[in-house]
């Protein structure tokens, strides 16, 4: 596991974008594993800028997202499909037919989960996966528990996660209570992983990642078992976890 300490969020986004650029430059039909939330927004802005400057080409790129809320369709402004369209896909030369997000409106959610894993495998797996981390150490919607599920699955959201995500909704009552989430097993198959950490509320989880044991009660610690993980934190976080 490689730790990079950067000055601030701007530099974090810049460094992450350069890593993505390297992958795309080496493999023009790469499969990118993408995440939502506020943390990767800076990265996406940098990628859009690179695309406009002809530094990277998305015409043959494919993407897979980590998760989606159950009950929200892609036209819903709070859905992760909508987020990805607004924050990235609408601004680069990507074929949206090559962008994959779990279907939160699927009639058979378990079947949707199985098909999603099948699709990732058909694409040849993920070349680079961007991750964020929750205050409780969750990765995607893999919440702390006595055991973690390897495959894409339907999961209930914890009170902590619902409260954290309520900032994106008008009220906490509007936050979905379930999601389709890629499992840790599928995430760990990615050839390269980049974990971006933003916000002091993540300090305890990051302390556990670097100073604690590997445990399902801090899902992020599972990343220690991957051969190519880069964790990017800012100086403020570095001081907080000393």
UniProtKB/Swiss-Prot annotation:
Keyword Hydrolase: yes
Cellular component, GO annotation: cytoplasm
Top-level taxonomic group: Bacteria
SUPFAM superfamilies: NagB/RpiA/CoA transferase-like (SSF100950)
Sorted UniProt keywords: Carbohydrate metabolism, Hydrolase
NCBIfam families the UniProt entry points to: nagB (TIGR00502)
Protein name according to UniProt: Glucosamine-6-phosphate deaminase
């Amino acid at each position: 596991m490689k730790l990079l300490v950067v000055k601030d969020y701007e530099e974090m986004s810049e460094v992450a974008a350069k890593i993505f650029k390297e992958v795309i430059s080496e493999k023009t039909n790469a499969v990118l594993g993408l995440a939502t939330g506020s943390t990767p927004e800076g990265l996406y802005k940098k990628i859009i800028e690179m695309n406009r400057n002809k530094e990277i080409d998305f015409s043959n790129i494919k993407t897979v997202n980590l998760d989606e809320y159950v009950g929200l369709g892609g036209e819903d402004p709070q859905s992760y499909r909508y987020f990805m369209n607004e924050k990235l896909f609408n601004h680069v030369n990507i074929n949206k037919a090559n962008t994959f997000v779990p279907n939160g409106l699927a009639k058979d959610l378990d079947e949707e989960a199985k098909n999603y894993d099948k699709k990732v495998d058909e694409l040849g797996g993920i070349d680079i996966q961007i991750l964020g981390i929750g205050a409780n150490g969750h990765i995607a919607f893999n919440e702390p528990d006595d055991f973690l599920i390897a495959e894409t699955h339907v999961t209930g959201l914890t009170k902590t996660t619902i409260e954290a995500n309520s900032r994106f909704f008008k009220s906490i009552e509007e936050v979905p209570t379930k999601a389709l989430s890629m499992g840790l097993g599928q995430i760990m198959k990615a050839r390269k992983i980049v974990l971006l950490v933003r916000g002091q509320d993540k300090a305890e989880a990051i302390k556990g990642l670097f100073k604690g044991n590997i445990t399902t009660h801090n899902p992020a610690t599972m990343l220690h078992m991957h051969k190519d993980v880069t964790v990017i934190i800012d100086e403020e976080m570095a001081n907080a976890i000393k």
